[in-house]
Amino acid sequence: MDASQLTRNLAGIVGEKYIITDPAKTEQYRQGYRFGEGRALAVVRPGTILEMWKILQACVEADVIVITQAANTGLTGGSTPDGNDYDRDIVIVNTMRMNIIQTINNNEQVVCLPGSTLNQLELLLKPLGREPHSVIGSSCIGASVLGGVCNNSGGALVQRGPAYTEMALFAQINEEGKLELVNHLGIDLGDTPEEILTNLQGHHYQRKDITQDAGKGHDHAYCDHVRQVDEPTAARFNADPARHYEASGCAGKLMVFAVRLDTFPQEKQTAVFYIGTNDINELTDIRRAALGEFESLPVSGEYIHRDAFD
């Protein structure tokens, strides 16, 4: 299939309004927040997860590279091409039109579609007396929920650790080289990809369809793991295999259509402390005491350079 045929097929899926091929108009999608830029055959903006699936089918058939992109706010790249030395054409699938969030299990969990943002989730949960795992992305409040899960974001979070779930709906190329949809959300949505995606998009399921013990909705062990201050390795580092599970930490190797996550009771009384010193060893002592000795862990913590502090 040639490039022009693929773009026609993609336009047939989403409509001419939601496919962009003009390089001047695709630049905002092809250029990263901090770094990374390259050519793309097209940017496609599906309005439903069924359209997203059909786009992926067409791209796999055409043997092009697919980059799934949400808010494009990441500081470490991965949401855009990086250079122009790829061996195939690239299609960017921007997910921000699909921003549905569904609360389940008495608001103790949520199901988030690819375009939902952390800020949107926080505002949804606040009147319910709940809060999400993370309340801000690495760079701004526009960061997506799924982007955080796919990249295990949340390095400053001490109590809850990196974004993580074992419950997701995703597509992968299997060992036979075939595209398949995998429903590990723990929600009975039907049998075919079309049924699963349509029923999820429309919230066409009931409480009886939800499996309660389908997997973890956050990293339950991190609060103990982070207290091990005498271990030879850091508790938190990029691409930690201990926090890779299907969609979690997949970093673009899967196309993720939805994740199921835990929510948390709102913190009633919190305070922010700024601690300044000219001796980095004092900060090390404070960190070791807070992690190793405090009865309650800090919600989050971050080192800030004196220039930023001032």
Language-model features, listed with the residues they occupy:
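Structural motif
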Residues: 17-19, 41-43, 64-67, 89-92, ...
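Short, solvent-exposed amphipathic alpha-helical segments in soluble enzyme
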Residues: 60-61, 187, 262-264, 288-293
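FAD-binding subdomain of flavoenzyme oxidoreductases
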Residues: 126-281
